[in-house]
Amino acid sequence: VGQNTGIRSRSVLSQTGSYKGIERMRQPLSRELSNLLERGRDRQLRLAVTGLSQAGKTAFLTSLVNQLRHAGVEAQLDLLPAAREGRLLGAQRLNQPDLGVPRFPYDPGMAALRDTPPRWPEPTRGISELRLQLRYRPARSGWLTPEIAHLTLDLFDYPGEWLLDLPLLQHDFYSWSQAQALHEGEQRRGLFSEWLTAVEQLDPAGEADEAQLAALAEEYAQGLRRAKKAGFSDLQPGRFLLPGELEGAPVLQFFPLPQLDASQHNTSRETLEALPANSLYATLAARFRYYQQQVVKPFYRDHFRRFDRQIVLVDVLGALNAGPERFEDLSSALRQLMHSFDYGQRSLLTRLFAPRIDRLAIAATKADHVTPD
Protein backbone atom coordinates (compact mmCIF):
# COMPACT_ATOMS: atom_id res chain seq x y z
CA VAL A 1 0.00 0.00 0.00
CA GLY A 2 1.58 3.28 -1.07
CA GLN A 3 2.13 6.39 1.04
CA ASN A 4 -0.81 8.11 -0.67
CA THR A 5 -3.21 6.03 1.43
CA GLY A 6 -2.69 8.27 4.44
CA ILE A 7 -1.20 5.50 6.59
CA ARG A 8 2.28 4.16 7.07
CA SER A 9 1.88 0.96 5.14
CA ARG A 10 5.12 -0.67 6.27
CA SER A 11 4.25 -0.43 9.95
CA VAL A 12 0.63 -1.43 9.39
CA LEU A 13 1.43 -4.47 7.30
CA SER A 14 4.17 -5.64 9.64
CA GLN A 15 1.82 -5.64 12.62
CA THR A 16 0.61 -9.09 11.63
CA GLY A 17 3.90 -10.11 10.14
CA SER A 18 2.99 -10.40 6.49
CA TYR A 19 4.60 -7.31 4.93
CA LYS A 20 7.99 -8.84 4.26
CA GLY A 21 6.41 -12.06 3.11
CA ILE A 22 4.40 -10.12 0.53
CA GLU A 23 7.48 -8.02 -0.29
CA ARG A 24 9.54 -11.09 -1.06
CA MET A 25 6.70 -12.67 -2.99
CA ARG A 26 6.62 -9.64 -5.30
CA GLN A 27 9.92 -10.64 -6.89
CA PRO A 28 8.70 -13.51 -9.12
CA LEU A 29 5.48 -11.61 -9.84
CA SER A 30 7.55 -8.55 -10.80
CA ARG A 31 9.67 -10.63 -13.15
CA GLU A 32 6.51 -12.00 -14.77
CA LEU A 33 5.03 -8.52 -15.26
CA SER A 34 8.38 -7.31 -16.57
CA ASN A 35 8.48 -10.09 -19.17
CA LEU A 36 4.96 -9.29 -20.31
CA LEU A 37 5.69 -5.59 -20.58
CA GLU A 38 8.57 -6.33 -22.93
CA ARG A 39 6.78 -8.85 -25.16
CA GLY A 40 5.40 -7.63 -28.45
CA ARG A 41 2.34 -9.87 -28.89
CA ASP A 42 0.80 -10.72 -25.52
CA ARG A 43 -1.25 -7.72 -24.42
CA GLN A 44 -3.46 -9.38 -21.83
CA LEU A 45 -2.77 -11.33 -18.66
CA ARG A 46 -5.35 -13.09 -16.48
CA LEU A 47 -3.86 -13.55 -13.02
CA ALA A 48 -5.72 -15.54 -10.35
CA VAL A 49 -4.88 -15.27 -6.66
CA THR A 50 -6.07 -17.58 -3.92
CA GLY A 51 -4.84 -18.62 -0.51
CA LEU A 52 -5.05 -21.41 2.03
CA SER A 53 -6.20 -20.81 5.59
CA GLN A 54 -6.27 -17.00 5.85
CA ALA A 55 -2.98 -16.42 4.06
CA GLY A 56 -3.81 -12.80 3.18
CA LYS A 57 -4.87 -12.93 -0.47
CA THR A 58 -7.37 -10.05 -0.29
CA ALA A 59 -4.81 -7.79 1.41
CA PHE A 60 -2.20 -8.79 -1.16
CA LEU A 61 -4.45 -8.00 -4.13
CA THR A 62 -5.56 -4.70 -2.60
CA SER A 63 -1.93 -3.69 -2.12
CA LEU A 64 -0.90 -4.84 -5.61
CA VAL A 65 -3.68 -2.86 -7.30
CA ASN A 66 -2.85 0.26 -5.28
CA GLN A 67 0.85 0.01 -6.13
CA LEU A 68 0.17 -0.37 -9.85
CA ARG A 69 -2.33 2.48 -9.91
CA HIS A 70 0.26 4.82 -8.38
CA ALA A 71 3.29 3.63 -10.31
CA GLY A 72 5.65 6.50 -10.97
CA VAL A 73 4.27 8.54 -8.07
CA GLU A 74 4.66 6.97 -4.62
CA ALA A 75 4.55 3.26 -5.37
CA GLN A 76 7.19 0.85 -4.09
CA LEU A 77 7.80 -1.32 -7.13
CA ASP A 78 11.59 -1.50 -7.12
CA LEU A 79 11.56 -5.16 -8.16
CA LEU A 80 9.77 -4.32 -11.41
CA PRO A 81 12.37 -3.02 -13.91
CA ALA A 82 9.81 -1.01 -15.89
CA ALA A 83 8.89 0.87 -12.69
CA ARG A 84 12.47 1.19 -11.46
CA GLU A 85 13.54 2.65 -14.80
CA GLY A 86 10.64 5.09 -14.87
CA ARG A 87 8.92 3.42 -17.83
CA LEU A 88 5.79 2.25 -15.99
CA LEU A 89 3.49 5.25 -16.24
CA GLY A 90 0.58 3.99 -14.17
CA ALA A 91 -2.61 1.97 -14.36
CA GLN A 92 -6.29 2.71 -14.52
CA ARG A 93 -9.30 0.61 -13.69
CA LEU A 94 -11.47 -0.49 -16.58
CA ASN A 95 -14.90 -2.04 -16.72
CA GLN A 96 -14.55 -5.80 -16.63
CA PRO A 97 -15.86 -7.73 -19.65
CA ASP A 98 -17.73 -10.38 -17.63
CA LEU A 99 -20.59 -8.53 -15.96
CA GLY A 100 -21.70 -11.72 -14.23
CA VAL A 101 -18.64 -11.77 -11.94
CA PRO A 102 -18.62 -9.42 -8.91
CA ARG A 103 -16.02 -6.64 -8.91
CA PHE A 104 -13.08 -7.13 -6.56
CA PRO A 105 -13.72 -4.93 -3.45
CA TYR A 106 -10.65 -2.72 -3.87
CA ASP A 107 -12.22 0.47 -2.50
CA PRO A 108 -13.58 -1.17 0.70
CA GLY A 109 -10.18 -2.80 1.15
CA MET A 110 -8.38 0.53 0.93
CA ALA A 111 -10.91 2.08 3.30
CA ALA A 112 -10.14 -0.65 5.84
CA LEU A 113 -6.39 -0.01 5.57
CA ARG A 114 -6.94 3.75 5.96
CA ASP A 115 -9.17 3.28 8.99
CA THR A 116 -8.11 4.29 12.51
CA PRO A 117 -6.82 1.91 13.65
CA PRO A 118 -6.13 0.21 10.30
CA ARG A 119 -7.95 -3.05 9.63
CA TRP A 120 -7.30 -5.91 7.26
CA PRO A 121 -9.75 -6.06 4.33
CA GLU A 122 -12.69 -8.39 4.75
CA PRO A 123 -12.06 -11.76 3.07
CA THR A 124 -14.07 -12.41 -0.06
CA ARG A 125 -16.55 -15.28 -0.09
CA GLY A 126 -16.69 -15.89 -3.83
CA ILE A 127 -14.93 -15.12 -7.07
CA SER A 128 -14.33 -11.48 -7.94
CA GLU A 129 -12.52 -9.66 -10.73
CA LEU A 130 -10.81 -6.34 -11.37
CA ARG A 131 -9.40 -5.15 -14.72
CA LEU A 132 -6.46 -2.76 -14.98
CA GLN A 133 -4.84 -1.21 -18.02
CA LEU A 134 -1.13 -0.61 -17.51
CA ARG A 135 0.58 2.16 -19.51
CA TYR A 136 4.33 1.89 -20.09
CA ARG A 137 7.16 2.83 -22.40
CA PRO A 138 8.76 -0.23 -24.05
CA ALA A 139 12.44 -0.77 -23.31
CA ARG A 140 13.27 -1.11 -27.00
CA SER A 141 11.99 1.23 -29.65
CA GLY A 142 11.43 0.48 -33.30
CA TRP A 143 9.14 1.22 -36.19
CA LEU A 144 6.78 -1.58 -35.03
CA THR A 145 6.92 -0.56 -31.37
CA PRO A 146 4.68 2.29 -30.19
CA GLU A 147 6.06 4.98 -27.91
CA ILE A 148 3.41 4.16 -25.30
CA ALA A 149 2.19 0.57 -24.94
CA HIS A 150 -0.62 -0.98 -22.91
CA LEU A 151 -1.10 -4.24 -21.02
CA THR A 152 -4.54 -5.35 -19.84
CA LEU A 153 -4.30 -7.09 -16.48
CA ASP A 154 -7.34 -9.06 -15.26
CA LEU A 155 -7.03 -9.93 -11.57
CA PHE A 156 -9.18 -12.66 -10.03
CA ASP A 157 -9.67 -13.43 -6.37
CA TYR A 158 -11.39 -16.65 -5.32
CA PRO A 159 -11.60 -18.69 -2.09
CA GLY A 160 -8.96 -21.32 -1.49
CA GLU A 161 -11.75 -23.64 -0.39
CA TRP A 162 -12.92 -23.83 -4.01
CA LEU A 163 -9.43 -24.67 -5.23
CA LEU A 164 -9.29 -27.60 -2.80
CA ASP A 165 -12.36 -29.08 -4.49
CA LEU A 166 -10.55 -29.66 -7.77
CA PRO A 167 -8.77 -32.83 -6.57
CA LEU A 168 -12.23 -34.36 -6.06
CA LEU A 169 -12.39 -34.84 -9.83
CA GLN A 170 -9.78 -37.60 -9.51
CA HIS A 171 -12.02 -39.68 -7.22
CA ASP A 172 -15.27 -41.56 -7.16
CA PHE A 173 -17.20 -41.69 -3.89
CA TYR A 174 -15.53 -44.90 -2.74
CA SER A 175 -11.94 -43.73 -3.23
CA TRP A 176 -12.74 -40.29 -1.81
CA SER A 177 -14.16 -41.86 1.35
CA GLN A 178 -11.01 -43.93 1.76
CA ALA A 179 -8.80 -40.88 1.17
CA GLN A 180 -10.32 -38.86 4.01
CA ALA A 181 -7.84 -39.00 6.89
CA LEU A 182 -10.41 -38.32 9.59
CA HIS A 183 -9.06 -41.12 11.77
CA GLU A 184 -5.48 -39.88 11.55
CA GLY A 185 -4.13 -37.30 13.96
CA GLU A 186 -5.41 -36.69 17.46
CA GLN A 187 -6.44 -33.07 16.89
CA ARG A 188 -8.35 -33.69 13.68
CA ARG A 189 -10.02 -36.81 15.09
CA GLY A 190 -11.18 -34.77 18.07
CA LEU A 191 -12.81 -32.17 15.81
CA PHE A 192 -14.94 -34.88 14.16
CA SER A 193 -15.34 -37.23 17.14
CA GLU A 194 -19.15 -37.07 17.51
CA TRP A 195 -19.70 -37.26 13.76
CA LEU A 196 -17.30 -40.22 13.45
CA THR A 197 -19.13 -42.08 16.21
CA ALA A 198 -22.47 -41.57 14.47
CA VAL A 199 -21.37 -42.33 10.91
CA GLU A 200 -19.50 -45.51 11.84
CA GLN A 201 -22.80 -46.98 13.04
CA LEU A 202 -24.43 -46.54 9.63
CA ASP A 203 -25.14 -49.50 7.40
CA PRO A 204 -24.12 -48.57 3.83
CA ALA A 205 -26.57 -51.17 2.51
CA GLY A 206 -29.48 -49.78 4.54
CA GLU A 207 -32.17 -47.54 3.13
CA ALA A 208 -31.28 -43.84 3.05
CA ASP A 209 -33.09 -41.61 5.55
CA GLU A 210 -33.26 -38.03 4.25
CA ALA A 211 -33.58 -36.45 7.69
CA GLN A 212 -30.64 -38.45 8.98
CA LEU A 213 -28.54 -37.58 5.92
CA ALA A 214 -29.23 -33.86 6.33
CA ALA A 215 -28.36 -33.95 10.04
CA LEU A 216 -25.11 -35.87 9.54
CA ALA A 217 -24.10 -33.69 6.59
CA GLU A 218 -24.58 -30.58 8.73
CA GLU A 219 -22.58 -32.15 11.55
CA TYR A 220 -19.82 -32.98 9.07
CA ALA A 221 -19.89 -29.38 7.77
CA GLN A 222 -19.58 -28.11 11.35
CA GLY A 223 -16.52 -30.34 11.78
CA LEU A 224 -15.00 -28.81 8.64
CA ARG A 225 -15.65 -25.32 9.98
CA ARG A 226 -14.03 -26.21 13.30
CA ALA A 227 -11.05 -27.64 11.42
CA LYS A 228 -10.72 -24.47 9.33
CA LYS A 229 -10.83 -22.32 12.46
CA ALA A 230 -8.11 -24.55 13.96
CA GLY A 231 -5.95 -23.86 10.89
CA PHE A 232 -6.34 -27.07 8.89
CA SER A 233 -6.20 -26.73 5.10
CA ASP A 234 -7.07 -30.13 3.60
CA LEU A 235 -10.84 -29.72 3.87
CA GLN A 236 -13.28 -31.20 1.37
CA PRO A 237 -15.82 -30.46 0.01
CA GLY A 238 -14.94 -26.76 -0.04
CA ARG A 239 -18.52 -25.63 -0.66
CA PHE A 240 -19.46 -26.99 2.74
CA LEU A 241 -17.41 -24.09 4.14
CA LEU A 242 -18.73 -21.46 1.69
CA PRO A 243 -22.06 -22.82 0.41
CA GLY A 244 -23.42 -19.55 -0.97
CA GLU A 245 -26.59 -20.14 -2.97
CA LEU A 246 -26.28 -23.91 -2.40
CA GLU A 247 -26.91 -23.71 1.33
CA GLY A 248 -29.58 -26.23 2.32
CA ALA A 249 -29.60 -27.92 -1.10
CA PRO A 250 -29.43 -31.75 -1.25
CA VAL A 251 -26.22 -31.50 -3.29
CA LEU A 252 -24.47 -30.50 -0.05
CA GLN A 253 -26.09 -33.26 1.99
CA PHE A 254 -23.48 -35.97 1.65
CA PHE A 255 -20.36 -37.02 3.54
CA PRO A 256 -17.63 -39.67 3.33
CA LEU A 257 -17.93 -43.14 4.81
CA PRO A 258 -14.50 -43.61 6.44
CA GLN A 259 -15.35 -47.15 7.54
CA LEU A 260 -15.15 -48.51 3.97
CA ASP A 261 -12.61 -51.33 3.75
CA ALA A 262 -11.89 -53.04 0.44
CA SER A 263 -10.65 -56.14 2.28
CA GLN A 264 -14.08 -56.71 3.85
CA HIS A 265 -16.70 -58.28 1.58
CA ASN A 266 -19.63 -56.24 2.92
CA THR A 267 -17.80 -52.94 2.29
CA SER A 268 -15.89 -53.83 -0.88
CA ARG A 269 -16.37 -51.65 -3.96
CA GLU A 270 -18.06 -54.43 -5.94
CA THR A 271 -20.57 -55.19 -3.18
CA LEU A 272 -21.48 -51.55 -2.54
CA GLU A 273 -21.83 -50.56 -6.19
CA ALA A 274 -24.36 -53.37 -6.67
CA LEU A 275 -26.69 -51.90 -4.01
CA PRO A 276 -30.09 -50.44 -5.03
CA ALA A 277 -30.46 -46.72 -5.74
CA ASN A 278 -32.32 -46.05 -2.47
CA SER A 279 -29.52 -47.45 -0.30
CA LEU A 280 -27.41 -45.16 1.87
CA TYR A 281 -24.25 -45.84 -0.13
CA ALA A 282 -25.89 -45.32 -3.54
CA THR A 283 -27.56 -42.09 -2.38
CA LEU A 284 -24.30 -40.63 -1.05
CA ALA A 285 -22.42 -41.72 -4.19
CA ALA A 286 -25.04 -40.12 -6.44
CA ARG A 287 -24.82 -36.81 -4.59
CA PHE A 288 -21.03 -36.91 -4.72
CA ARG A 289 -21.18 -37.38 -8.51
CA TYR A 290 -23.69 -34.54 -8.83
CA TYR A 291 -21.41 -32.30 -6.78
CA GLN A 292 -18.51 -33.14 -9.10
CA GLN A 293 -20.51 -32.54 -12.28
CA GLN A 294 -22.64 -29.53 -11.30
CA VAL A 295 -20.47 -27.65 -8.79
CA VAL A 296 -16.78 -28.46 -9.26
CA LYS A 297 -16.57 -28.91 -13.04
CA PRO A 298 -18.43 -25.69 -13.97
CA PHE A 299 -15.98 -23.65 -11.89
CA TYR A 300 -13.04 -25.45 -13.48
CA ARG A 301 -14.49 -24.97 -16.97
CA ASP A 302 -15.82 -21.41 -16.68
CA HIS A 303 -13.06 -19.82 -14.61
CA PHE A 304 -10.09 -21.89 -13.54
CA ARG A 305 -9.05 -23.18 -16.94
CA ARG A 306 -9.17 -19.65 -18.41
CA PHE A 307 -6.55 -18.24 -16.02
CA ASP A 308 -3.09 -17.60 -17.47
CA ARG A 309 -1.20 -17.35 -14.19
CA GLN A 310 -1.97 -18.54 -10.66
CA ILE A 311 -0.63 -17.44 -7.28
CA VAL A 312 -1.39 -19.59 -4.21
CA LEU A 313 -0.59 -17.95 -0.87
CA VAL A 314 0.23 -20.28 2.02
CA ASP A 315 0.70 -19.63 5.74
CA VAL A 316 3.56 -22.10 6.24
CA LEU A 317 4.69 -20.49 9.49
CA GLY A 318 1.28 -21.00 11.07
CA ALA A 319 1.38 -24.69 10.18
CA LEU A 320 4.92 -25.04 11.56
CA ASN A 321 3.95 -23.37 14.81
CA ALA A 322 0.92 -25.65 15.18
CA GLY A 323 2.95 -28.85 15.09
CA PRO A 324 3.46 -31.92 12.88
CA GLU A 325 -0.22 -32.73 12.35
CA ARG A 326 -1.08 -29.30 10.96
CA PHE A 327 2.08 -29.20 8.85
CA GLU A 328 1.38 -32.62 7.33
CA ASP A 329 -2.20 -31.52 6.63
CA LEU A 330 -0.92 -28.48 4.71
CA SER A 331 1.57 -30.66 2.83
CA SER A 332 -1.21 -33.06 1.87
CA ALA A 333 -3.37 -30.21 0.56
CA LEU A 334 -0.53 -28.85 -1.57
CA ARG A 335 0.31 -32.28 -2.97
CA GLN A 336 -3.29 -32.70 -4.12
CA LEU A 337 -3.37 -29.24 -5.67
CA MET A 338 -0.38 -29.95 -7.89
CA HIS A 339 -2.55 -32.35 -9.91
CA SER A 340 -5.11 -29.63 -10.64
CA PHE A 341 -2.86 -27.39 -12.71
CA ASP A 342 -2.06 -27.63 -16.42
CA TYR A 343 1.52 -26.90 -17.32
CA GLY A 344 3.30 -26.03 -20.53
CA GLN A 345 4.20 -23.06 -22.66
CA ARG A 346 1.24 -21.54 -24.48
CA SER A 347 1.34 -21.95 -28.25
CA LEU A 348 -0.72 -19.74 -30.52
CA LEU A 349 -3.48 -22.35 -30.81
CA THR A 350 -3.47 -22.90 -27.07
CA ARG A 351 -3.63 -19.18 -26.41
CA LEU A 352 -6.56 -18.67 -28.78
CA PHE A 353 -8.67 -21.75 -28.12
CA ALA A 354 -7.65 -23.42 -24.86
CA PRO A 355 -6.10 -20.96 -22.40
CA ARG A 356 -4.59 -22.63 -19.38
CA ILE A 357 -2.32 -21.91 -16.44
CA ASP A 358 1.29 -22.20 -17.54
CA ARG A 359 2.89 -20.40 -14.60
CA LEU A 360 2.20 -21.19 -10.96
CA ALA A 361 3.68 -19.45 -7.91
CA ILE A 362 3.23 -20.84 -4.42
CA ALA A 363 4.24 -18.14 -1.95
CA ALA A 364 4.74 -18.39 1.81
CA THR A 365 3.53 -15.30 3.67
CA LYS A 366 4.72 -13.99 7.06
CA ALA A 367 8.35 -14.54 6.05
CA ASP A 368 9.46 -11.66 8.30
CA HIS A 369 8.72 -13.85 11.33
CA VAL A 370 11.65 -16.09 10.38
CA THR A 371 14.92 -14.80 11.85
CA PRO A 372 18.11 -14.74 9.71
CA ASP A 373 19.70 -17.52 11.79
Question: Where do the PLM segments sit?
Answer:
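Conserved glycine(s) of the Walker
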Residues: 55-56
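GTPase G-domain guanine-specificity segment
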Residues: 369-373
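Post-Walker A alpha-helix
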Residues: 60-61
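Pre-Walker A (Motif I) flank of P-loop NTPase domains
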Residues: 43-46
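N-terminal pre-Walker A segment at the start of P-loop NTPase domains
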Residues: 14-38
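P-loop (Walker A) phosphate-binding loop of NTP-binding proteins
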Residues: 52
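Hydrophobic anchor at the beta1->P-loop junction of P-loop NTPases
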Residues: 49
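Switch- and interface-adjacent substructures of P-loop NTPase systems
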Residues: 29-36, 40-41, 67-356
